Structure formats: structure tokens, C-alpha cells
Regions:
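A conserved FAD-binding loop/helix module that cradles the flavin
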Residues: 50-78
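Rossmann-like nucleotide/phosphate-binding core characteristic of flavoprotein oxidoreductases
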Residues: 28, 76-194
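FAD-site-proximal beta/loop scaffold in flavoenzymes
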Residues: 5-57
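Alpha-helix termini
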Residues: 25, 37, 64-65, 80
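Short, surface-exposed linear patches
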Residues: 29-32, 57, 69-72, 164-165
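Non-transmembrane, aqueous-exposed alpha-helical and coiled segments at domain scale
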Residues: 41, 54, 65-68, 101, ...
Length: 194
């Protein structure tokens, strides 16, 4: 028991994205936030998203970390004379059944783009796609699950010519919808697969 004067509850948060809609930013139907790549850039060149506008966070530490990454990538974008980090990406691929099974696509610059496809209990991932040429050595992928699961493993697979190869596994005693999860992907791990 804790003595207190006020209890504030934050329930059922939905990201506010009126400005994103006006700009033509594609929104994730699960999070109601923008669909982003590894740089946290949206489908609109030069528009980056982070924090609770992207997806609801549990901890301000995650928001700060994400804001730092988005700010760094936005500064890099400006310094590269406004060259988009994601030209030609089809960021709706996460939601298209026809894209399941494709390990990667090429954008207009022949840059391999890997769509992250949520399956099983995983409801969504941030980012939704990875450009290998822009990916750091290690990339934190955050996600939420749709139900409580005990004694489980989070597996990352690469689909390669109609076969799946597990490239990463992370055992968890329990996962729950109310707690954001994360898994670290290595660039070298992904470069091994076409």
C-alpha cells in the first residue's frame, strides 16, 4: 500500500498524427503511428518520427533513445543535401500477403530493403523495413505482442527461396501486450542472406 493524493492512469493511448496525415505519411494500422525504416524516416523524404507519435512507449528512456536516433538520422539527412534514406521503398509491404516470403526487395537505387513482417503473437515492429546500406552495425527492433505468453522465444527468420532460416533467437520467461519488447539485429547477420 502506498499513500497518495492522486493516481494518474494513462490507458488506451493513440498517437496523434494529424500533421503526419496532412503530409501524406503512411500510418501503421496497428500502432496508428507512422511506418518507418531503420533511420526512423517515414515514406515522406526528410520526415522522421519518434516517441509516442510513432508508437506508445512504456518508459521515457525508450523515448529519449529513439529521439536521439531520429535526430541523428535527420541531421545526417540534412548534411547529405536532402538525399532521402529511403527512396522507392514500399513501406506498405508489411501488410501485404504477397510480400510474405520475400527476403528483400530493391528500391530505386538497387539498395536491398528488408521488410520486417510480424507473425505469430508479434503485432508490429519498429522499424518496419531495413535498408542494409543505412543500417548501423547493431539495430534495436522494438515490438509488442498480442497476448501473454510464458516460457517463449522470439525468433527472427529470413525467408530465402521458399525456405526460412532462423538468424536470431531470444528466450523470454514471459511476454505481455503491456510491455514493449526488443531484439538486437546485427548487420553482418542480415548480410549473409540475399
Amino acid at each position: 500500500e502506498y499513500a497518495c493524493d492522486t493516481l494518474l492512469l494513462s490507458c488506451g493511448l493513440i498517437p496523434e498524427n494529424e500533421l503526419s496525415r496532412e503530409l501524406g505519411v503512411k500510418l501503421n494500422p496497428v500502432t496508428s503511428g507512422p511506418v518507418v525504416d531503420e533511420s526512423l524516416e517515414t515514406n515522406v523524404p526528410g520526415v522522421f518520427a519518434c516517441g509516442n507519435v510513432l508508437h506508445v512507449h512504456d518508459l521515457v528512456d525508450f523515448v529519449s533513445e529513439e529521439a536521439d536516433r531520429a535526430g541523428t538520422c535527420a541531421a545526417r539527412y540534412i548534411l547529405q543535401e536532402n538525399q532521402s534514406s529511403n527512396p522507392g521503398i514500399d513501406q506498405e509491404s508489411q501488410y501485404s500477403d504477397s510480400d510474405i516470403g520475400k527476403a528483400s526487395k530493391m528500391n530505386d537505387n538497387n539498395d536491398p530493403v528488408i521488410p520486417l513482417i510480424s507473425t505469430g503473437c508479434v503485432r508490429y515492429t519498429v522499424p518496419s523495413a531495413i535498408h542494409l546500406s543505412k543500417m548501423p552495425d547493431k539495430l534495436k527492433v522494438r515490438f509488442r505482442v498480442g497476448k501473454v505468453v510464458k516460457n517463449c522465444a522470439v525468433d527472427v527468420y529470413c525467408n530465402e527461396e521458399n525456405s526460412e532460416k532462423r538468424i536470431k533467437t531470444k528466450k523470454r520467461p514471459v511476454v505481455a501486450p503491456g510491455e514493449m519488447e526488443e531484439i538486437l539485429l546485427g548487420r553482418e547477420e542480415l548480410l549473409k542472406y540475399p
